[in-house]
């Protein structure tokens, strides 16, 4: 049986971490949204061989157990005692190591696909609970809708969807290691976005007002090591973005625009400035 799933990228409308847990991992307080930039994940189950194989069109991704999609298949195969082999083919569109959750979304897509292929009958809530051991972004990616995400990433509260907004995403030509950034956090120096106010504004349908509450507490940490991210954000702001900020731990920066003409202006201006630029919409 073959199942194909769309795996959308995510952006962080708000990203905050007020403290670390005793296990050393951050406590998250985030608002996340899927965007229409997506990988496509095709999963095939077969009796022979009984192994898990991953193939991608990207030379930057491992094809073994380090790949989050592989880990997702392994979890379901082991938990539900499935003897079938699994072949996973990932058509990458989302930039790798970009702060856009591409690997996490691929893993979530594998969970949804195998749930269908093996007829496990699991709800999205059950898949999300199983997924936390893979990565903190995977539970959100199981749902891929506007959500308030807290805890280790396992508490996902759906929020009303934004109306039609345009998003320009730009990834500078550099890589950022999330574990390195997280180790560099000085909690006494973090500037915290108004995440709770953002959540309330979204719940009340005050989407334009919500822009003032968006922010990313880790911007300063990443920008200290990579000042070109700050320059990219400033360029988006000067070009008229309603909001411009870094997604995740970077290096991607996104501009949120209510008008398509403004988004096109930013997109066209950045194409000669940045190697990877995308104009998409919020999902």
Curated annotation (Swiss-Prot):
> What is the name of this protein?
4-diphosphocytidyl-2-C-methyl-D-erythritol kinase
Question: Pathway, according to UniProt?
Answer: Isoprenoid biosynthesis; isopentenyl diphosphate biosynthesis via DXP pathway; isopentenyl diphosphate from 1-deoxy-D-xylulose 5-phosphate: step 3/6
The organism's taxonomic lineage, starting at the top: Bacteria, Bacillati, Bacillota, Bacilli, Lactobacillales
* Family annotation (SUPFAM superfamilies): GHMP Kinase, C-terminal domain, Ribosomal protein S5 domain 2-like
Q: Which pairs of Cys residues are joined through disulfide bonds in the record?
A: none
**Enzyme Commission (EC) number:** 2.7.1.148
Organism per entry: Limosilactobacillus fermentum (strain NBRC 3956 / LMG 18251) (Lactobacillus fermentum)
Question: Which purpose does this protein serve, as stated in its record?
Answer: Catalyzes the phosphorylation of the position 2 hydroxy group of 4-diphosphocytidyl-2C-methyl-D-erythritol.
Lipoprotein recorded as keyword: no
Highest taxon, organism lineage: Bacteria
Molecular function (GO) terms for this protein are: 4-(cytidine 5'-diphospho)-2-C-methyl-D-erythritol kinase activity; ATP binding
């Amino acid at each position: 049986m073959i199942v194909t799933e769309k795996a959308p990228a995510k952006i962080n409308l708000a990203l905050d971490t007020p403290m670390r847990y005793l296990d050393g991992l951050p406590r998250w307080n985030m608002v996340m949204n899927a965007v229409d930039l997506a990988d496509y994940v095709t999963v095939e189950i077969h009796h022979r061989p009984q192994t898990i194989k991953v193939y991608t069109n990207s030379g930057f991704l491992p094809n073994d157990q380090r790949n989050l999609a592989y880990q997702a298949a392994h979890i379901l195969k082991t938990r539900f005692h499935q003897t079938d082999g699994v072949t996973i083919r990932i058509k990458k569109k989302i930039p790798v190591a970009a702060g856009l959750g591409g690997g996490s979304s691929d893993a979530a897509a594998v969970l949804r696909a195998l749930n269908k292929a093996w007829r496990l009958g699991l709800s999205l809530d059950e898949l999300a609970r199983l997924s936390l051991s893979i990565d903190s972004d995977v539970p959100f990616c199981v749902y891929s809708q506007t959500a308030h995400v807290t805890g280790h990433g396992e508490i996902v509260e759906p929020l009303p969807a934004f109306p039609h907004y345009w998003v320009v995403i730009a990834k500078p030509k550099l890589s950022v290691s999330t574990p390195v950034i997280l180790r560099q956090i000085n909690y006494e120096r973090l500037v915290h976005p108004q995440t709770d106010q953002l959540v309330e504004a979204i719940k009340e349908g005050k989407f334009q007002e919500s822009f003032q509450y968006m922010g990313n507490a880790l911007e300063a940490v990443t920008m200290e090591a990579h000042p070109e991210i700050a320059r990219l954000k400033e360029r988006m702001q000067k070009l008229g973005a309603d909001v411009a900020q870094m997604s995740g731990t970077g290096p991607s920066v996104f501009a949120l625009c209510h008008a398509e003409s403004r988004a096109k202006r930013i997109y066209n201006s950045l194409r000669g400035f940045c190697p990877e630029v995308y104009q998409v919409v919020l999902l």
